[in-house]
Amino acid sequence: MKLSPPKKNLPPQKNNEPPFPYLRLLVQVGIALFLVWIWQESLHKATVSTIPYSEFLNKINQKEIIECKITPDEIYGKMLVSKPEEKGQPPKIALFSTVRVDDPDLVKRLQSAGVVYGSVKPSLLSQILFSWVVPILIFFLVWFALARFMGGGGAGYSLLNIGKSRARLLVDESTGVTFADVAGCDEAKYELQEVVDFLKNPSRYRALGAKIPKGVLLVGPPGTGKTLLAKAVAGEAKVPFFSISGSEFVEMFVGVGAARVRDLFGQAKSKAPCIVFIDELDAIGRQRGVRIQVGSDEHEQTLNQLLVEMDGFDPNEGIIVLAATNRPEILDRALLRPGRFDRQVVVDLPDANGREAILRVHARGKPLSENIDFKEIAQATMGFSGADLANLLNEAALLAARRKSSRIEQVDLLEAMEKVIAGPERKSRVLSEKERERVAYHEVGHALVAFYSEHAEPVRKISIVPRGKSALGYTLQLPTAQKYLLSKSELLDRICVAMGGRAAEELIYGDITTGAENDLEVATTIARQMVCLYGMGEKSGLAHYVPPQPLLGGLDTSYLKECSDETARIIDLEIEKILEENYQRALSILRHHHVELKEVTKYLLQKETLNAEEFKSILENLKEQRKEAPSYSSTL
């Protein structure tokens, strides 16, 4: 079977056209007429006085009934309200209605009183209107409203096409993305090159009896470029690209998701060779049988249909299914077996080189200054995803526009990086002089402990400008190189640096504040990881006391207890010991360098922000002064 290339000019898609072009207009006209009729009826009833039948008989005897009409259900007409006060004036007449009672003498009473009366028989048209048309119209309006509600806001979605797939079809001209637009994930691109080559040259693989994976699962934290990679595969292979989110399959009605899966693969077969991309696969691919909630049947039917479609279509049809998720651990095992999503491509956070390449990709089309150093930014943004870096460049462009500059400068990138890391400046948050001084000592305490610790990361900036929601100041440390392993000494130094702010407060004021809350949280987390994960405790041994944490994007610190009570007590004592020892070490460092602590704090209070060069310059000047004065003492 030979695969024919897709046509360049695909016919326009009509999935979104409403089934009846004038349906909305007809419904609106019907509603308007119905409301006008109700309004007229309400006005008529407002002018009619309803009286009891006994009063109606009394008015007949008093000859106050002028005329009346008799229907099967009621009697209505005109009655005299009051006689004219003067001659020549007309009498006051009002409309009335009363319930008809089975009274054989009614006609005689009307004749004797001289009342003009008659009988009214309801027309066949009104009977049909009230018996059939109005109920059908109300039912149709409810049905139409429900159909629009279930449509999810898209034009043309209704109960008539609720089982249609909502996949968006892009052809090679409209994807606009190739592998040149993707950076920072070279290994993932290499894995997907095979898929592209198969779509371009399928005969070479079939001649060797090779089978391309039916499904490729892109796994990685949010923002790492999984969707962009899928578009790049379609752009490189120049084949139609169906894109849909997993949440778009599932609706309120059971069976809709399965119908949409069938419709999606039906469209894909008609456009083969092509790529079907399902974003957020975990929305429909969760493990079956573990949820007890409303809607479980719909999720499971949708998943079952997806399993059937992936294992049922002919492998020579040229349909490649790409999917993305950041929670592979909750996917059903049947999805990951050979024959379905049998290949997993990890799209991890980029390293320093990858971040630099991503920055260069996102900087295309932006006016940049000649002094831009992407390498410096890349080294300083460890842990940033591709989306974070794109946001960083956008923030830099906004800052440059705010300065009314025609180009993006390095200072804009650095300020944008700080804004992303620590939050925007809170210029409206005004601190008292005492609080400002305490914050300065706190931040300088962090910086000095980091500077005099052998394995701590270098200090890049110290600031007492409030940022974000709660930060009154911050000390920015940036690594000099990408690290994949951390030694025990490095971890202990990180704890010691975190304790530096609290130690400085106690040393200067003899009192402590709530400002070290986040520092204590960070230090405790590192200490717990050392004891429970890395076997670095003295008495806890080499056992691993924490269950696996499969969620991507970092370790979950809500540890589950998987040890005896005695072992848990030992772990708590080990953690407490590590924290206390490093707190005392931070105190010792600051006592030995208390002059530096006061001098740097004095400069920080004057300038509010010190960069790495200024910080080092102050310390070097103090060091020179110490050499020139032999009696210089730095002990507290």
UniProtKB/Swiss-Prot annotation:
UniProt cofactor note: Binds 1 zinc ion per subunit.
Binding site for Zn(2+): H442, H446, D519
Active site as annotated: E443
The keyword Zinc appears for this protein: yes
EC id: 3.4.24.-
One GO term of the biological process aspect: proteolysis
Cofactor: Zn(2+)
The keyword Transmembrane helix belongs to this UniProt entry's keyword annotation: yes
Chain sites annotated for binding ATP: G220, P221, P222, G223, T224, G225, K226, T227
Ranges of the Periplasmic topological domain: 40-126
Top-level lineage group: Bacteria
Any one GO molecular function term: ATP hydrolysis activity
Top EC class, one word: hydrolase
Topology in membrane: Multi-pass membrane protein
SUPFAM superfamilies: FtsH protease domain-like, P-loop containing nucleoside triphosphate hydrolases
Cellular location(s): Cell inner membrane
One GO location term (cellular component): plasma membrane
InterPro entries hit by this protein: AAA+_ATPase, AAA_lid_3, ATPase_AAA_core, ATPase_AAA_CS, FtsH, P-loop_NTPase, Pept_M41_FtsH_extracell, Peptidase_M41
PANTHER family, per the entry: ATP-DEPENDENT ZINC METALLOPROTEASE YME1L1, METALLOPROTEASE M41 FTSH
Chain's role: Acts as a processive, ATP-dependent zinc metallopeptidase for both cytoplasmic and membrane proteins. Plays a role in the quality control of integral membrane proteins.
Similarity section: In the central section; belongs to the AAA ATPase family.
Record-given protein name: ATP-dependent zinc metalloprotease FtsH 1
Source organism: Methylacidiphilum infernorum (isolate V4)
Taxonomic lineage: Bacteria, Pseudomonadati, Verrucomicrobiota, Methylacidiphilae, Methylacidiphilales
